């Protein structure tokens, strides 16, 4: 099979991952914090090493990752592994997250390469100008989100007060390795190619719920050296990302 963009049908699953057994508690007295004052645009790429159209989309998102005010994340999905190459970065929960967007946006299928911007809209990753336009339009959309503050200790994050959506929101931690990574693909449509990725996600966890009141959450304790974490507050219903921040050094 040699196609630019792939789609796959199947039952719609609820977006989610393994819940963290952390303690969520009201944010009390504040310690020294690092605050991200600018609301970023979150760009989530769903890709696969065995998808022939994905290397081009990976390059589009890598270019976006260098733009100020953009948080770019790469999720490798596993539903193309059966074609002959098991994706080295894929995890089942990443495909579940993509299917959550499929349900919220009422899409007929999931596909690769797909780019989701701020959880509000999606576009094919093969369409570079369309991706850039969507990011620019979302950057111009400014709301009044809750503030996210990473504690200097590195083990906790606070989400401040704000207007919660009807039905509430969820707080997610996305652990990723900043920068590019390359993989030599040994099978499938990209056999023999070196496929480059940026900001590859390793772990996705729900930290807890957010209902508009300040809460302090424990961050995943199993991060590896060199990894960073994005914390995002996301509408439970339509999956819109209300706000996000990364602890990656500026």
State each model region's role.
Residues 83, 118-121:
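Charged, low-complexity surface segments at secondary-structure and domain boundaries
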Residues 75-78, 118, 153:
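Short loop/turn motifs enriched for small/polar and acidic residues
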Residues 88-112, 120-250:
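Short, conserved sequence motifs used for protein processing/export or organelle targeting and
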Residues 3-6, 13-105, 109:
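Active-site-proximal cofactor/substrate-binding loop regions of enzyme domains
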Residues 115:
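Ligand-binding face of N-terminal immunoglobulin V-set domains in extracellular IgSF glycoproteins
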């Amino acid at each position: 099979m040699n196609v630019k963009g792939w789609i796959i049908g199947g039952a719609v699953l609820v977006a989610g991952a393994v819940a963290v057994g952390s303690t969520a508690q009201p944010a009390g007295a504040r310690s020294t914090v690092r605050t991200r004052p600018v609301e970023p645009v979150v760009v989530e790429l769903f890709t696969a090493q065995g998808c022939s159209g994905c290397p081009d989309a990976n390059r589009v998102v890598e270019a976006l990752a260098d733009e100020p005010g953009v948080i770019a994340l790469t999720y490798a999905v596993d539903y193309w592994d059966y074609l002959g190459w098991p994706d080295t970065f894929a995890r089942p929960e990443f495909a579940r997250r993509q299917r959550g967007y499929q349900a919220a946006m009422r899409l007929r299928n999931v596909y690769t390469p797909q780019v989701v911007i701020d959880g509000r809209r999606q576009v094919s990753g093969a369409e570079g100008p369309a991706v850039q336009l969507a990011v620019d339009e979302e950057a111009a959309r400014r709301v009044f989100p809750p503030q996210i503050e990473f504690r200097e200790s590195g083990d906790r994050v606070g989400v401040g007060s704000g207007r919660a959506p009807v039905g509430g929101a969820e707080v997610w931690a996305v652990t990723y390795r900043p920068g590019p990574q390359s993989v030599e693909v040994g099978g499938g449509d990209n056999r023999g190619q070196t496929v480059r990725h940026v900001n590859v996600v390793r772990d996705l966890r729900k930290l807890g719920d957010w209902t508009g009141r300040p809460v302090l959450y424990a961050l995943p304790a199993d991060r590896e050296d060199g990894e960073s974490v994005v914390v995002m507050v996301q509408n439970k219903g339509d999956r819109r990302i209300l706000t996000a921040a990364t602890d990656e050094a500026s």
